[in-house]
């Protein structure tokens, strides 16, 4: 049995079942999900074991049970933010404002180019090759 199956066996509450992507409860919740702005958010919590794997941390089944309600609470806070009516408020910062403050994307030459090349593990003209950071397939 994999770790997901083990979590399903240990899951005793509906809250815990939300965090297992294989559960029929979470699939039914996804299918029947509607947007409502109550104190409970309509946003679904993430698959906690997968989130931990992506963050490169290991969680015990006890920690999954401990963090599940805390993550649910954070998601509920986001639901409360979504319920705020912002139609009458003028935005102060917008993505489409004029006046780009970005510099021109132009190549630069460095005075000590050879020192940079000597400091990296692999060099293939004109690229500096570095080791893989994420080993996802």
UniProtKB/Swiss-Prot annotation:
Record organism: Vitis vinifera
Keyword match Nucleotide-binding: yes
Family: Belongs to the GatC family.
Gene responsible for this protein: GATC
Organism superkingdom: Eukaryota
Protein name listed in UniProt: Glutamyl-tRNA(Gln) amidotransferase subunit C, chloroplastic/mitochondrial
Gene Ontology CC annotation, any one: mitochondrion
EC code(s) of this entry: 6.3.5.-
Record's miscellaneous remark: This protein may be expected to contain an N-terminal transit peptide but none has been predicted.
């Amino acid at each position: 049995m994999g770790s997901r199956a083990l979590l399903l066996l240990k899951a005793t509450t509906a809250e815990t079942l939300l965090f297992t992507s294989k559960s029929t409860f979470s699939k039914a919740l996804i299918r029947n999900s509607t947007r409502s702005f109550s104190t409970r958010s309509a946003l679904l919590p993430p698959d906690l074991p997968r989130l931990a794997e992506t963050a490169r941390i290991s969680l015990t089944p006890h920690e999954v049970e401990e963090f599940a309600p805390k993550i649910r609470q954070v998601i509920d806070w986001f639901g409360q933010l979504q319920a705020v009516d912002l139609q009458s408020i003028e935005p102060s910062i917008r993505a489409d404002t004029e006046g780009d403050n970005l510099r021109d994307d132009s190549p630069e030459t460095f005075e000590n180019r050879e020192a940079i090349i000597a400091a990296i593990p692999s060099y293939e003209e004109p690229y500096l090759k570095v080791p893989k950071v994420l080993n996802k397939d």
